[in-house]
């Protein structure tokens, strides 16, 4: 039944008029609809390239913040973040269906329900899988998150197969022209949502008891326990919040690309690079790193020959090597010494 539902989504998505004449092949990362092959087009397409990079970067930024939240509270690098994003995208597709299917849920409700389900799954995985094995150390837990990633990927493969799926934009209508640059309406949802999430995180961290308790667990877990904070509970909250952020990123991403069961690992890698670029403890840095990486990726792939662009997934690896070479002392000390 579920597989049949996804088949309907796939057929409808490829026939959608709202998605225009686009035929973007998923290559392991968000490929925004207005990113053409720019090698022959020259600098005339630079504004569109930068716009694509910023939109891509916002998705990477949300995933990077997810990594940051989990790491700051627990010391665990969650390599399942991309698959939480994939789950959010796939569940949104399943619940909403393409082109306003009257037999499916309204789009807004589909997004909320998908994000809530992934959030609960994230919390349950922490309680049932991560938490009982904390004493084995952070390296073991990191490897465990890779196993969770494989589990989520396999779980998505069973009902969806290896097909790609698409969703209509949140707001229908032609692209908006700003200073001569055509911007699809979904881009405004992505950028605006990222800014709103940043504002909500700042408010939550500085104005709510839960946020302050999370920060206390981050700064000094022992002292937090002494003042009555249940650190174990906030491990669960951190994983749930990380899953929520990733799932929301997947839900707002899927209208501008095609989703597939194996989209998670490349996004995890890119989010990890963005997180490292921005500093492992700074939410603002994670956003800056995500947007910066997105722009760099767009420029490199956009102005490269097709033979080079086909190896686009190597960009984050090369950038990570450069960052670790240039700032090797600061980054490694921060990642290792802080959590001993």
Model-derived segments and spans:
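Pore- or pathway-lining transmembrane helices of multi-pass membrane proteins that form conduits
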Residues: 82-87, 126, 133-157, 264-276, ...
